[in-house]
Amino acid sequence: MSLKLEHVNYIYSPGTAYEIHALKDICLELKSGEFVGLIGHTGSGKSTLVQHLNGLVKATEGRILFHGEDIYGGGYDMRRLRSKVGLVFQYPEHQLFEVDVLSDVCFGPRNQGLTKEEAEEKARAALAMVGLGEEFYHQSPFELSGGQKRRAAIAGVLAMEPEILV
């Protein structure tokens, strides 16, 4: 299993006075079981690159292959890709939106077509993984501490059981 970027370029506001080349000729392969760190200065393209990994942003040029399939190919199932490549944002607490923690963590699995019971089972397991017990299930995610919000948001991605976690 791998996620491969081949000569990926990305330009913000192409053809305008505000054109910015955020990514230039990026070649990268992420293989199963690898842990990869991405470092760089503010504005160096780290977040832009990460957004390409599950198709949130489309490369201006180049290809991205998941399990050997071009994600920009006609008819590619981007919904499936996004459930297989889980993305935790730089400020994951901004991902929270439901009325309680358990509902928030269930959102992804429910969008994958799971029943309420199946989604809750995955959500409970993910919340346990990040150290949030039953006492948090019915709390508003907005009443949690900053660290608890981050853990709840990460649990929301883990509950979808992605093959790759970014």
List the predicted regions and their residue ranges.
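Helix-to-loop junction immediately C-terminal to a conserved catalytic motif
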Residues: N54
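Conserved ABC ATPase signature
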Residues: S140-L144, Q148
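A short, flexible loop at the N-terminus of ABC-type nucleotide-binding domains that lies
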Residues: M1-S2, I11-D25, G74-D77
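The feature captures the beta-strand-to-loop junction immediately N-terminal to the Walker
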Residues: I39-H41
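Conserved catalytic motifs of ABC-family nucleotide-binding domains
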Residues: E161
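Conserved ABC ATPase "signature" region
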Residues: E117-E135
